[in-house]
């Protein structure tokens, strides 16, 4: 049996009827996480900021993290894996899914590369568009707005600044304003992952 986990952006790009047809046609079983990884990751950031000093960069977007590292080494990178990676680790370790292939779809190539480098047992990461191409299925247009827009950290009781898009990130981290923030939310794609190279 082959299990398929669909990231939230891609899930918005396919109707329930089309998904059901795709799963049946290709003998795939959709799987979801049992844990609420978004809430768990948010709690990890809260705990980090409660116990550490200085300014941290949100580490959910590896492309943005790479950019910040190259431009402003004084900004600390949170040692917290992206939500998608947390989900994949759960699926790779779950006894009820043991010894079966798990396909984890991603909204971008860099997240797929990050996941595959972990070499999780029976688990393969692939951008949504490449997954569909590999099984000969057409891709619907990406949504106009991200299901995970900037603002993930808005309820944390710390100074949080949100930046999306390379120009905005570059401008912010090469200035001095970042020193006033405790956490910088970073999304390399403007306004969210719906602009990722894995869903376009």
Mark where each language-model region is.
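Iron-sulfur-associated redox domains of electron-transfer enzymes in respiratory
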Residues: 1-200
């Amino acid at each position: 049996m082959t299990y398929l986990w669909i990231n939230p952006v891609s899930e918005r790009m396919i109707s329930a009827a089309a998904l059901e047809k795709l799963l049946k046609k290709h003998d795939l079983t959709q799987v979801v996480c049992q844990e609420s990884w978004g809430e768990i990751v948010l709690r990890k950031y809260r705990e980090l900021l409660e116990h550490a000093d200085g300014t941290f960069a949100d580490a959910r977007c590896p492309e943005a993290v790479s950019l910040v590292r190259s431009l402003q080494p004084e900004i600390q990178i949170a040692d917290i894996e992206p939500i998608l990676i947390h989900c994949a680790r759960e699926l790779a370790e779950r006894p009820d899914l043991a010894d079966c292939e798990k396909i984890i779809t991603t909204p971008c190539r860099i997240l797929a590369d990050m996941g595959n480098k972990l070499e999780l047992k029976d688990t393969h990461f692939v951008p949504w568009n490449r997954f569909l191409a590999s099984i000969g299925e057409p891709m619907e247009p990406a949504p106009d707005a991200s299901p995970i827009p900037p603002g993930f950290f808005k309820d944390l009781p710390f100074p949080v600044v949100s930046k999306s898009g390379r120009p905005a990130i570059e401008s912010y981290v090469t200035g001095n304003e970042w020193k006033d923030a405790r956490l910088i939310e970073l999304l390399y794609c403007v306004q969210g992952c719906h602009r990722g190279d894995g869903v376009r």
